[in-house]
Amino acid sequence: MTDTAAVRGLDAQGYIAREGSLARVPAVFRPVVAAARERLTDLFGVRLHSAYLYGSIPRGTARVGRSDLDLLAALHDEPAEADHAGARALVEALDAEFPQIEGGGALLYGRARLLSDLERHDMGFFVACLCTPLLGHDLAASLPRYRPDTLLARETNGDLGLLLPRWRERVARAGDAGDVSDSEHTRRSLVRYMSRHLVRTAFTLVMPRWNGWSSDLRVMADVFAGYYPERAAQVRAAAALGYEPTGDAAVLTAYLDDLGPWLAREYTRVHGTKAARPEDATAS
């Protein structure tokens, strides 16, 4: 592997290298990971095909009391709503028990969907390159290797235009909350989520030209800035808020009225629109 390829998250052949490993999990987070492994097994039993960690914990960059626990579980069959509810309860229990983490989430998919043609360059890529095996047989063995090309860009983040109306609804609901402290907390969560999503979308917009991969928000923002200097300050500010969010409603307004719509238009112009998913037809 060349030094340049390593810095840009690629292997010697120019494919995106898998990030994260259990060996990189900081010692303080290992009890959380062990508990997650045990409880996922208890929750899903023989229905569980495999489970994965992703995010800062397996990358070794998690911050005590600030980072969340991110899990993905692949079931042999398609998950039902009760399964999603059970996974949410599992993460909430871990969050309450372990002060090392601040929140988290668990994605649930059926094995067949993760290996499908439709998901090959979205969730398939996510599992193969951004997830660290925790339990079961690693699905990456059944998935291709990935280059940072326009197909990957389109299928990972080419749906921002579809997401923006849903984000507006979430922000409106946060504004309608009766309890001021609850509203502040909700806005802070939305700022964190939207900031990260917009920075990642800005990065994958230019990813094929840069020819590399990173999951570091600041690196992503800096890479984007090299191609769109007129938007650099906005995306760098979003990267900072992705790590240290506030509950400022003005930030959300700027995302929804300016940066988000511009980025969605430019993304569609450059890469096209992500292939429709079945749930898109029924999503509100």
Predicted regions and their residues:
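Conserved NTP/Mg2+-binding pocket subregion across the NTase superfamily
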Residues: 3-28, 32, 88-189
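Short, well-structured alpha-helical interface segments that form or flank functional binding sites
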Residues: 66, 122, 193, 197
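Catalytic metal-binding acidic patch
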Residues: 53-89, 105-108
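Short acidic amphipathic segments
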Residues: 47-55, 101
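Generic structural marker for isolated residues within well-ordered, non-membrane alpha-helices
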Residues: 37, 91, 221
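Conserved nucleotidyltransferase catalytic core and NTase-mimicking acidic/glycine-rich helix/loop elements
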Residues: 2-6, 139-284
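Helical scaffold of the NTase/Pol beta-like nucleotidyltransferase catalytic core
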Residues: 1-50, 231, 235, 283-284
